[in-house]
Design a protein with these regions (language model features):
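A metal-dependent hydrolase signature that marks the N-terminal structural subdomain at the beginning
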Residues: 2-70, 74-79, 88
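Extended low-polarity, hydrophobic cluster-rich segments
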Residues: 40-43, 94, 98, 136
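Surface-exposed helix-capping loop/turn segments at secondary-structure junctions
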Residues: 49-56, 110-113, 145-149
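Short pre-active-site segment immediately N-terminal to the catalytic Zn-binding motif
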Residues: 80-97
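Post-HEXXH active-site segment of zinc metalloproteases
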Residues: 91, 107-136
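Active-site recognition of the HExxH zinc-binding catalytic motif
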Residues: 95-108
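Long, well-structured alpha-helical subdomains associated
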Residues: 124-127, 138-149
Length: 149
């Protein structure tokens, strides 16, 4: 009976220590991810200074978890989503945020959002006129931002 309790407390103790280690690692990883939010917020403010549009700036949301996307802009919620896992390099994050900012800049009405969707159906993503422009602006602005910062 004493050996049962000994093993029980050893196993419970090991699980407790492992859970503490796990929480500590999560805390350290979260601190490392903060650079992404700070950089994205700085780039967003920089874009707003260069290309002001409306009073209400877009919300910025950094998303954890797997995705095939680097980022996206949602007109209805006025939100730019950045997928952390696909923006681990400074250049990629700046380029993605600049790209999505230009979607925000160009899609400023329901009719323009509808036009984007119609063109997406007609041209596809790679040949979409707005995607071509946003890709070019994202790359150009990323070089300019990183050169100065």
């Amino acid at each position: 009976m004493d050996t049962f309790f000994t093993y029980y407390f050893i196993i419970v103790g090991v699980f407790f220590v492992l859970s503490l280690i796990h929480e500590g690692i999560k805390l350290l990883v979260r601190d490392q991810d903060d650079w992404q939010f700070e950089l994205a917020n700085d780039v967003l403010n920089w874009c707003l200074e260069l290309y002001p549009l409306r009073k209400q700036k877009p919300q910025l949301t950094l998303v954890d978890g797997e995705s095939t996307l680097a980022g996206e802009y949602n007109f209805y919620t006025n939100t730019i989503f950045i997928y952390r896992v696909n923006n681990v390099l400074r250049h990629d994050l700046v380029k993605t945020l600049s790209h999505e900012y230009f979607h925000y800049y160009l899609i400023n009405s329901e009719s323009k959002n509808t036009l984007y969707q119609k063109q997406l159906d007609h041209y596809g993503y790679d040949s979409h006129p707005q995607e071509i422009l946003c890709n070019a602006m994202g790359e150009t602005l990323a070089k300019l931002y990183l050169k100065k910062n």
